[in-house]
Amino acid sequence: MAVDSSNSATGPMRVFAIGNPILDLVAEVPSSFLDEFFLKRGDATLATPEQMRIYSTLDQFNPTSLPGGSALNSVRVVQKLLRKPGSAGYMGAIGDDPRGQVLKELCDKEGLATRFMVAPGQSTGVCAVLINEKERTLCTHLGACGSFRLPEDWTTFASGALIFYATAYTLTATPKNALEVAGYAHGIPNAIFTLNLSAPFCVELYKDAMQSLLLHTNILFGNEEEFAHLAKVHNLVAAEKTALSTANKEHAVEVCTGALRLLTAGQNTGATKLVVMTRGHNPVIAAEQTADGTVVVHEVGVPVVAAEKIVDTNGAGDAFVGGFLYALSQGKTVKQCIMCGNACAQDVIQHVGFSLSFTSLPC
């Protein structure tokens, strides 16, 4: 696997992430286009072999190309807020093809430090983002993403970073990547490893790998559905409570404190240990183990966005994490980090595709 590390980032790097890099192709399409490819409006699916021609066929609608993929979206927010080129770094795998070059150029344009591993003979991950009647339909081909392996000298690229981030999506390639990043961060004084649960299927399919990973995790992110699955898979709450909704504050708190035990293993090392659950329009719930071993619960309200201004909520979670990590890099409190995450999510949901409109710091 060849290495492409030709961008001109200046640093110093504050945040480093690994993930599945995707080139989003965003276009408005008629219903007949969805029908042609057997897509249901509003769904998010992986492309079947029969659907692979969708990406070339989409050219007739002049799609807009945007960097995509959960972790890449989040570090784009961090880079936007930190401003100085190279402040946020990212690694993943792309194909040796024009889409990979476009993706890299878009990241370079935003000032992001990237080191993409190029997988010969494979195509760059791509997602058709189809807008029809104000709804978004996604059809994704992961391509080279599954080939990613950390290069031996990745720590040189990430030198200086004290915040490390991975999504559970990376477990689909191999758990070794995230485990290596987490282990490295664990050995650096004051470094923090953060993990996103990403999706219910990640929680269910990678139970053992995630349990090992969580022991080296300082901050765990996820939405209420993902945490509900975590609670069920790891028996965090009594069996009769697994069907309860985390829209109920008391149950959300119980799930978060249960998840916190997966991070601490019942011990207090003095290290940062925090679980953060987003709940849509309901307040964010976070459970934190403080330096003296006590557990503190935080509840932070979510600003209201008028319904007519909400265009696309798909990237809200990615934007939240990006805002949170930026604030964390600035030494902000847990509450301030959550508020910054909320502000970034609030901005992103008012646009089609994952784009950032703020010209001044939102937090």
Curated annotation (Swiss-Prot):
Enzyme class: transferase
Example of a GO cellular component annotation carried by this entry: cytosol
Cofactor(s) this protein cannot do without: Mg(2+)
CC cofactor note: Binds 1 Mg(2+) ion per subunit.
EC number, UniProt record: 2.7.1.20
Catalytic activity line of the entry: adenosine + ATP = AMP + ADP + H(+)
Pathway: Purine metabolism; AMP biosynthesis via salvage pathway; AMP from adenosine: step 1/1
Active site as annotated: 318
GO biological process: AMP salvage; purine nucleobase metabolic process; purine ribonucleoside salvage
Listed InterPro entries: Adenokinase, Carboh/pur_kinase_PfkB_CS, PfkB_dom, Ribokinase-like
Residues annotated for Mg(2+) binding in this entry: 185, 188, 191
One Pfam family it belongs to: PfkB
PROSITE patterns for the chain: PFKB_KINASES_2
Function summary: ATP-dependent phosphorylation of adenosine and other related nucleoside analogs to monophosphate derivatives. It is a key purine metabolic enzyme in the opportunistic parasitic protozoan toxoplasma gondii as it cannot synthesize purines de novo.
Entry's family note: Belongs to the carbohydrate kinase PfkB family.
Protein name: Adenosine kinase
Protein encoded by which gene: AK
